[in-house]
Regions:
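Residue-level detector of solvent-exposed, low-hydrophobicity positions
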Residues: 51, 62-64, 91, 98, ...
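Sequence/structural signature of outer-membrane beta-barrel proteins
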Residues: 6-12, 44, 98-116, 137-152
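Detector for outer-membrane/organellar transmembrane beta-barrel domains
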Residues: 89, 113-174
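Outer membrane beta-barrel
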Residues: 1-100, 114, 123-126
C-alpha cells in the first residue's frame, strides 16, 4: 500500500522488511464460522506449529524449517490463502486453499513456483486445558532452472500432530 500511494520513508524498492508479516481480511459469523483471505498463518501452523512454537520461537522441528520457504510452500505464513475455520462442539475444524503464487528465488539460481494446494486440520479440545491437533498440507509446485531449462513438478505433503496441555500456569506440548 505505501508504494501505491508514494508514502515517503514507508517503502523502498526491493526491500522485504515486511514480507514476513501477515495481511489478510475476512468475515466472521457465529453461525457459519470464519473465512479469511491473504497472507496469514497456515492451517498447519494454527493446529500443529503454534502448540510447539513456545520455546524461544526457534521452529527448528516445524514444517517451515524443513521446506523451501514457509510463505510460499504453505507451511507457515502462507501468501494468497483462503482459510475457513468453524467450531463444532469440542472441535475446531480448518480448511484452506492455496492459490498460485509468484516465483520465489531461493538465491541458488533456481526458481520455485507454487501452482496451488490446500490444507485440512482439526483441533480437538479433549478437556478445557488439553488440546490435540492434527493437520495435513498439500502444495503443488514447480522448480525450474533457467540456466539449463530443467524443470520438475513436486507434490509436497506435510502431515503433523501436536498435543498441548496447559494446567494452571504451566504449559506442556509435544
Amino acid at each position: 500500500i505505501p508504494a501505491q500511494f508514494n508514502w515517503d520513508h514507508h517503502y523502498a524498492d526491493g526491500a522485504h522488511d515486511t514480507s514476513r508479516r501477515m495481511l489478510y481480511t475476512g468475515l466472521k459469523s457465529d453461525t457459519w464460522g470464519t473465512l479469511t483471505f491473504g497472507q496469514q498463518n497456515s492451517v498447519y501452523y494454527d493446529v500443529v506449529g503454534a502448540k510447539t512454537d513456545i520455546w524461544d520461537y526457534d521452529m527448528i522441528g516445524q514444517a517451515p524449517g524443513n521446506g523451501i520457504n514457509g510463505d510460499y510452500d504453505g507451511s507457515y505464513r502462507s501468501r494468497q490463502m483462503l482459510k475457513y475455520k468453524k467450531t463444532v462442539g469440542d472441535a475446531d475444524i480448518y480448511a484452506s486453499y492455496l492459490f498460485e503464487d509468484s516465483e520465489y528465488l531461493p538465491g541458488n539460481g533456481l526458481r520455485y513456483k507454487r501452482k496451488g494446494g490446500g490444507s485440512l486440520g482439526i483441533d480437538y479440545h479433549l478437556t478445557t486445558d488439553l488440546t490435540w491437533g492434527a493437520a495435513w498440507n498439500y502444495t503443488r509446485a514447480d522448480m525450474r532452472n533457467p540456466d539449463n531449462g530443467d524443470s520438475k513438478s513436486y507434490d509436497q505433503n506435510i502431515l503433523g500432530t501436536a498435543l498441548s496441555w496447559t494446567p494452571d500456569n504451566w504449559t506442556f506440548s509435544a
